[in-house]
């Protein structure tokens, strides 16, 4: 991002997350897409082509998507995993893994409390902070990647986890399962976009169009086990993936949760809260 803002890079295609797209649009860092070069856009599920971070997909197209949830060991956790509150259950002390990621960890806590994960209300944010400080003695570790090995080795009972990672873990250990709590979650999107610093906009659009070919989208999704927004790719995926309700939930996806939005200057308040939690 810093390189693009400084104009010192020649990237033609970038793959930002949804809240970064919103920020980059606000800073006029992205080209508008010429859909005359993107005829494969028709392959995308319409549920994903007009979301809050980029209305009418003027500057980006979705590449992969998924949810945040809880991956858990069915032998260690026998009750329903239907609420974020289970991450605060004292009987799992020392067996809970949380993400070392401020927006994700604070976000699911806000959802547990009934608030938006994009809140700018300091009272709500402080309530989430106190909940996470209270949870800290129960937490085995705050991780980003190494939690996966611990879940496979059955060293922990549960972990905050992205949906695609959960599917890979379940492939490695059949005792693991994935759940999306009923309070709602984060819907995330990785996207494809063209920065204004690109010197090859038309060629970049042709590459994005190539990535939206059903067989290419299916290969990418199958390899990393994250959901594809390409509706024509679903029939090319392994049946166990295409019919997995945690990878491909049906209906109105907005009922599952929220997309992270760019918080602007208020991001510093989340950073301060996260520092207080980690240092408590």
Task: Place the predicted regions along the sequence by residue.
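Ligand-binding "clamshell"
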Residues: 25-32, 54-58, 168-180, 242-244
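Mature extracytoplasmic/periplasmic domains
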Residues: 195-254
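Short beta-strand->loop
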Residues: 31-42, 60, 174-186, 195-198
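Conserved C-terminal helix/tail region of periplasmic/extracytoplasmic solute-binding proteins
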Residues: 250-280
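Ligand-binding pocket segment of bilobal, Venus flytrap-like solute-binding proteins
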Residues: 97-101, 105, 109, 117-183
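Early extracytoplasmic/lumenal segment of secretory-pathway proteins
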Residues: 1-23
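A bilobed periplasmic-binding-protein/Venus flytrap-type ligand-binding module shared by bacterial periplasmic
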Residues: 69-76, 111-114, 188-203, 208, ...
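A conserved helix-loop-strand patch within extracytoplasmic ligand-binding domains
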Residues: 37-97
């Amino acid at each position: 991002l810093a390189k693009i803002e400084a104009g010192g890079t020649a990237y033609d295609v970038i793959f930002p997350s949804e809240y970064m797209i919103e920020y980059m649009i606000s800073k006029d860092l992205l080209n508008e897409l010429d859909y005359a070069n993107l005829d494969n856009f028709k392959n995308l599920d319409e549920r994903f082509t007009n979301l809050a971070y980029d209305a009418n997909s003027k500057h980006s197209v979705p590449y992969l998507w998924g949810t945040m949830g809880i991956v858990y060991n069915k032998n260690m956790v026998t009750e329903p995993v239907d609420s974020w509150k289970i991450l605060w259950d004292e009987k799992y002390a020392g067996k809970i893994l949380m993400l070392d990621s401020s927006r994700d960890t604070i976000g699911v806590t806000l959802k547990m409390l009934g608030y938006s994960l994009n809140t700018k209300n300091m009272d709500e944010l402080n309530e989430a902070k106190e909940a996470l400080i209270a949870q800290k003695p129960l937490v085995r570790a705050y991780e980003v990647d190494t939690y996966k090995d611990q879940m496979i080795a059955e060293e922990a009972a549960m972990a905050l986890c992205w949906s695609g990672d959960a599917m890979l873990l379940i492939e490695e250990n059949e005792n693991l399962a994935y759940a999306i709590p009923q309070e709602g979650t984060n819907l995330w999107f990785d996207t494809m976009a063209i920065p204004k610093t690109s010197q090859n906009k038309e060629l970049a659009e042709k590459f994005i169009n190539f990535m939206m070919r059903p067989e290419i989208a299916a290969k990418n999704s199958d390899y990393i086990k994250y959901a594809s927004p390409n509706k024509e790719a679903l029939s090319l995926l392994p049946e166990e993936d295409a019919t997995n309700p945690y990878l491909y939930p049906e209906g109105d996806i907005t009922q599952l949760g929220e997309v992270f939005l760019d918080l602007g200057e208020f991001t510093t308040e989340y950073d301060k809260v996260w520092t207080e939690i980690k240092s408590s």
